[in-house]
Amino acid sequence: MGTSIPRFTFDTPTKPGNDFYALCEGEQPLVMIFLPAFDHPVTREYLTHYLKTYARLRGVRLACVVRSSARTVAQATQGAEFPFPIICDAPGVLYSYLGVEQARGLRSWSFAAQRIYKTAKEQGYRYDSSAPQILPLTLVVGHLGKILFIHSGRSQTDLPEDCTAIREIAREVTSTLAAGPEGPRTRCSDETLTLPDLVGWDDGDNDR
């Protein structure tokens, strides 16, 4: 923590070329939640929770990241607007940059995940149970992309349950920061990158 995500541009289902640092501006902290692909049962479950409880999201902002293209999400939602940004990262550049983990089999399961998959299967969803599954990542981000808090999920459902939980995480982080000594100086880049440019940003290798 204390380091910064470099500046980049991202696409949402309805608007391309958004500035990440512009998203980070303002007095309210930004909570970023990394999810699997948009059509994944876990993603659908938690996005539904966040939409239903969005009115409780006071004093904090939310952005969800999905491993799908903006076009795919736009087609699935028929161009509908979300009340919070959906950052589309089909190649998984942000996931790799931030070290979002994957796990196979029972290592990624929870009782909540079993329930979600059971319901999805009853609705016709098919999946490869042996394939690695993306584990969620929760960040609280401040000005200039400074990472204030990070939690790597230990299971597919180890993430904030709803917007009340998101609000409480942000409040706890801001209260802790206000009570403690000044954190390390933000390290950031003045260059605006695209998502693919993030690969190798920190080690100088931009040929990957």
Where are the regions that the model predicts?
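N-terminal "domain-start" segment that seeds a small globular fold
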Residues: M1-E25
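A structure-centric feature marking long, well-folded core domains of fungal metabolic enzymes
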Residues: T9-D11, P29-L30, R56
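Structural microenvironment flanking redox-active thiols in thiol-disulfide oxidoreductases
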Residues: R44-Y97
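Short active-site neighborhood of thiol/selenol oxidoreductases, capturing the structured segment around
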Residues: D19-K52, R61-V65
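Short loop/turn microsegments at loop-to-beta-strand junctions
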Residues: I5-P6, V31, L135-L137
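Thiol/selenol-based redox catalytic cores and closely related redox-interacting motifs
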Residues: D89-D158
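A short, polar/charged loop-to-alpha-helix boundary motif
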Residues: Q156-S175
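Cysteine/selenocysteine-centered motifs that mediate thiol-based redox chemistry or coordinate metal-sulfur cofactors
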Residues: S175-R208
